[in-house]
């Protein structure tokens, strides 16, 4: 049976996630990462297939082998399994994937380095484990100070929420997708 009563979508009011313009939110149903790892295998596959083409370079700064497996299976090129202080190579990457927080760098310095290694149109994917609800805002502010724009917010939900259950924060990972800002915003307090 087909419902012949068509209902209009509600008119959006305000900005769910602060951004200029508003940032789209996407939900990916993927398994949760194992303890001490940044992502599940399914998350690695989604990131690689959605954010990179076969000839693109991907910089893998994530904990665990999941992204590397996805890169190999998809015949993509990768560079750097850990954040080495010596350098990230000379070639620009289309995708940089990292967990958060990053060791041995201030957030703004880390994002300045990411921006310097991004190819035009490239993205930085920052995976945030559930927990601190203010953390995504802090990450976006640091990225903006480094000249990166907040492009998309992905909610990686490992199970559907249940009515009346207060554990909504413990069922997902936030993935913030950042890209080079068209507007120059130096590393000042802006």
Give the ranges of each region predicted by the language model.
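Class I S-adenosyl-L-methionine-dependent methyltransferase catalytic core
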Residues: 1-190
């Amino acid at each position: 049976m087909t419902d012949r009563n068509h209902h209009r979508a509600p008119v959006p009011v305000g900005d769910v996630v602060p951004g200029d313009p508003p940032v789209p939110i996407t939900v990916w149903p993927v398994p949760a990462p194992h303890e001490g790892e940044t992502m599940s295998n399914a998350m690695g596959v989604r990131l690689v297939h959605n954010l990179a083409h076969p000839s693109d370079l991907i910089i893998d700064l994530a904990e665990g082998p999941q992204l590397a497996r996805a890169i190999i299976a998809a015949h993509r090129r990768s560079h750097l399994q850990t954040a080495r202080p010596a350098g990230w190579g000379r070639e620009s990457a289309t995708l940089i994937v990292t967990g958060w927080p990053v060791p041995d760098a201030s957030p703004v310095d880390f994002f300045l380095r990411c921006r310097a290694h991004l190819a035009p149109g490239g993205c930085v994917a920052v995976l945030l484990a559930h927990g601190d609800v203010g953390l995504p805002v802090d990450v976006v502010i640091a990225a903006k100070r480094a000249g990166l724009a907040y492009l998309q917010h992905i909610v990686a939900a490992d199970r559907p929420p249940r009515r009346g259950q207060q554990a909504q924060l413990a069922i997902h990972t936030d993935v913030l997708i950042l890209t080079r800002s068209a507007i120059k915003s130096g590393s000042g307090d802006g």
